[in-house]
Every structure is written in C-alpha cells, then in structure tokens.
Amino acid sequence: MGKSVAILGAQWGDEGKGKIVDLLTDRVKYVVRYQGGHNAGHTLIINGEKTVLRLIPSGILRDNVTCLIGNGVVLSPEALMKEMGELEARGINVRDRLKISEACPLILPYHVAMDHAREAALGKNKIGTTGRGIGPAYEDKVARRGLRVSDLFDKEAFAEKLKDILDYYNFQLVHYYKVEPVDFQKTLDDVFAIADVIKGMVADVTTLLHQARKEGVNILFEGAQGTMLDIDHGTYPFVTSSNTTAGGVATGSGFGPRNLDYVLGIIKAYCTRVGSGPFTTELFDEVGAEIARKGNEFGAVTGRPRRCGWFDAVAVRRAVQINSISGFCMTKLDVLDGFEELKICTAYKMPNGEIVEYAPMAAKDWEGVEPIYETMPGWSENTFRVTKREELPQAALDYIKRIEELVGVPVDILSTGPDRVETMILRDPFAA
C-alpha cells in the first residue's frame, strides 16, 4: 500500500522544504504542487550544484518521478517556460514528466502590473509581495473572471475574455494608479505561443492522483511558503494569497484529506521572515545579524534579506493545530553552532498582561506582544554535515528535545547542511 505524505512549512516560509522534498523523492512516483505560484523559491544543492525551482515541483531532478501541478497553483506561462528552459539546458527531461491541471488559473502581465502598482501606492504600508502577480491572479479566481489553462485552447473565446479583463485592469492602472496600460495584442501573441508548447502537458491531475492511490504508489505533496503566511490562518493581512496549510492539499489537487497518511512540518532551528508583518522573536542585535550571516538568509526568489529571530514555539504550536502535523524536519541546526546560549519562546505576554501559549490570528492582535523566553546552553562543537544522531553534542540534543516537548510533536528528520546527503532520517515518513 502506497503512502501519501505532505511536506509544508510550519513557520513563515523559507524553512528548507525544497531540499527535504528532493531527499524523499527517491521513495515516490509523484510529486505534487498544490498552491502558490512562482513566488516560491525552493533551493536544492546536489553534489555541490545549486538549483532554484519556483514553479516546477522539486521532484523534477529525479528521473523516475512524475511532477504534477494541481489546480490550486496559479500558473505563469512565462515563468514556466523560463524554468523549463533552464532545466532542459541541463539535460533534464521536463516535458514528458510534468503534468499541469487544466483548472490552474493563469498569471498574465496585467496581474504583475497591478501587483507592482499597488505595492508602490501603499508605500511604507506595503504587504511585501514578491511582485509576481500571485495575489491579483487569485483575486480573479475568486471573482470568477480569471482565465485558466483550459481556456488557452479555444483561441477565439480566450481573446474575447482577455479583452474584457484587460479593459477592467487597464482602466485601474491608467486612471487610478497612473501607470502604463498592458498591451492586448502582445499579451495575446505571447500566451498563444506558449500554449502550443504546454498543450501536451495538460492533464486531469485529480484523476491521475486517485489512480496512483489505487496502484499503491507513494505520492508526495510539496507545499510552498509557510503556515503563518496562510491566507486564512496566517498573520493577516501580511500573508500570501493561498492556503499554505495541509487543507490546501485537498482543495489544490482534488485529493481528499482522508487520503493523507503523514504531514511533515519543516521548521528551522530558529525563525526567519521575509517582508512585512508580525515577528515576535525578531532580533535586532548582533546575534540576529550573525544568524543571518551564518544561515545565508536571503530570499531564493527575491534576494531580500530575511528577518531573523529565536525559535518561536508559540507560533509552531499553532502550525501543529492547523496542519495535524505528524512529525517535524528541523533544518539549519548547524547555524546555531558556536552560540554561548540559545533562547526559545515558550509563551507570549499580551498587552493586557495575559500569558498565552498559542499565537493570535490577525496581525493587529500581535501589536505589543512580548516573547517569554526560556534560555538554554549553546554548544561549541561543529554540527555541520553530521549525519549520525549520536555524534551531535548533548546540548544540541537537549535543545531539540525541549522543542519537541514544547510543541508536542517529534523531530523525525534533522538537516545539518544544504546538500541532500547532509541529513538524518530518524523516522521515515513513508514508513511511519
């Protein structure tokens, strides 16, 4: 009997999901993206060679894996072609191994233009989007005016719909935001050129998944961003536009929740966040700067520096609740090497003096929140590239154990470096 495993971020994204997905894909037949778009940057380092995937599932680097893009993903045809070209230039067969749901909403140039115009108008109050049109494309989906992959293959009807939508967007862009309009004919010509290339990759992803389940093969669902950026459960409004949580697997692929056997939450040994929004344990001192330097904390897609802070058990407890997390993979343990002491946030002190152990939902409810820390001894030994648990310093083992106690879920995988081999699998999600 095959197993179905979801891998998702349990913090604010950038936890190291891509590496872990790639590591576990030697056990699976299918890897599935079910939400987000090319705003996700999944960095893989294999034999010293770095690959950043934004849209195509991380399983594409394994020859025996078929990659699926589910209906919950907003698809930029332009970004897809660029990423395919980069992979094919390295001899990777993409076209025969990538299937795309016909129900994926399309990201088109007017979505990108609107994204940039809005962020510029918001100034210092901006959300901190990646500027790739993700939010506007999801808006069109919910407003039922969006174009989908299936629309690409009726060119006459597509052109009519595009004209109506572009009139709507260009009116706002020109008259409200005072920026240049998006050209209809260029948009049409560009997208039709790409449509002819991807036509053979379009499939009924939901049916493929259910057939795979019947055949008893292993399936891996690859989440993007992180739990605290979920449109419903994150620090709203400083969130992404999709459901980054385990529930997104069902809605974004058509694979029902009872079919999931294991949910692997990815956590860093500390916390990071990109862009605006609440971050209770953020460090503004030399310690924070040192974590950022040692952890190379810059966004894989945007290049933006990440905000760094101590591990926040309060926020991660919320992630455990929302996702029914079975076990954790802790990444970047080695970044904490050499610190004399480490801190873990165990509770929040609210502005009214109340002590809480679960994170608030809305961003406004985080205002004035103070972290309550527990201090633990650090370690001077090197954990980089350690692949046996018994070779870790006792202080590192104690740190991991304390986090397990605080969040109520075991750490089943430990990552001590960027390469796929620099990992300890303590409990295999596909054998659990």
Curated annotation (Swiss-Prot):
Homodimer. Its cofactor is Mg(2+). One of its GO terms (biological process) is IMP metabolic process. GO terms for cellular component: cytoplasm. Pathway: Purine metabolism; AMP biosynthesis via de novo pathway; AMP from IMP: step 1/2. It holds the Pfam family Adenylsucc_synt. GTP binds at residues 13-19, 41-43, 306, 332-334, 415-417. Mg(2+) binds at residues 14, 41. It is found in: Cytoplasm. This is Adenylosuccinate synthetase. The active site is at 14 (proton acceptor), 42 (proton donor). NCBIfam families: PRK01117.1 (NF002223), purA (TIGR00184). One of its GO terms (molecular function) is magnesium ion binding. Belongs to the adenylosuccinate synthetase family. It comes from Actinobacillus pleuropneumoniae serotype 3 (strain JL03). CDD domains: AdSS. Signal peptide: none annotated. PANTHER family: ADENYLOSUCCINATE SYNTHETASE. Plays an important role in the de novo pathway of purine nucleotide biosynthesis. Catalyzes the first committed step in the biosynthesis of AMP from IMP. It comes from the Bacteria. InterPro entries: Adenylosuccin_syn_GTP-bd, Adenylosuccin_syn_Lys_AS, Adenylosuccinate_synth_dom1, Adenylosuccinate_synth_dom2, Adenylosuccinate_synth_dom3, Adenylosuccinate_synthetase, P-loop_NTPase. Binds 1 Mg(2+) ion per subunit. SUPFAM superfamilies: P-loop containing nucleoside triphosphate hydrolases (SSF52540).
